[in-house]
Amino acid sequence: MKRVSLRDISELIFLSAIWGSSFLFLRLTSPVFGPIFLIEMRVLSGLAVLLPLVLFLGKLAEFQKHWKMIATVSLMNMAIPFCFFAFSAVYIGAGLLSIINATVPIFSACVAYVVYKERLSRSSLLGLLIGFLGVVVLLFNPDESFGSLGWLAILSALLACLLYGTAINLTVNNLQGVSGLAITAGGLFVSSLVLLPFAFWARPEVLPVGNLSLIHI
């Protein structure tokens, strides 16, 4: 077994901080721009950064060869769950969103077991059970009342996590050997095209130009 080094711990903390802060920014921006319009801006921003790298490194051929599976994964890993989380961020806090996001490994393992017949060891099952119980304990706070829209937001976030877990399994089983850059950039491209008409329809009447929320996108 590999020993966990200080660098491994530092990288985990750094990535956790980045991932966790995204929910805070989502909470700040989603009520301002609206969920779908916000996500369209985010995927377009990501595509603008990665597309030059794809062209420069010659990864476009990989996307062209595997575009059908990349498109399928992008819907389950970007377009739909991003919008679900953005909708949830309008009604529940960033802390709760990050807790719900912790169910992604649980859903991923369940999909692997049910769909791909992967065997889970007793220790894996025990870990999943403990993780699930931990999320339930943190989620059901007796001192907090969500209301009907709050519970709908929680369900939306859970569905997003289920889609993430499904996308992970699709990627592992169908996109082996394809570069992460091609998958990510291709996914952003497909997601931006799929969301474009919905974003145009759901765009805010007045764009908050000069608003600090623009920085958080």
Question: Which residue stretches match the model-derived regions?
Answer:
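Specific transmembrane alpha-helical segments of multi-pass solute transporters/efflux pumps
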Residues: 18, 22-23, 51-101, 137
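C-terminal transmembrane-helix exit sites in multi-pass transporters
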Residues: 49-61, 104-129, 202
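Conserved small/polar residues in nucleotide/adenosyl-binding loops
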Residues: 215-217
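Loop-to-transmembrane alpha-helix entry segments
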Residues: 61-69, 98-101, 117-137, 147-153, ...
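Hydrophobic transmembrane alpha-helices of multi-pass small-molecule transport proteins
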Residues: 50, 71, 111, 120-142, ...
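Structural motif at transmembrane-helix junctions in multi-pass transporters
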Residues: 30-38, 82-102, 176-182
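Glycine-/small-residue-enriched transmembrane alpha-helix faces in small-molecule transporters
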Residues: 1-39, 146-173, 181, 193-195
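Hydrophobic/aromatic residues within transmembrane alpha-helices
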Residues: 29, 38, 42, 88, ...
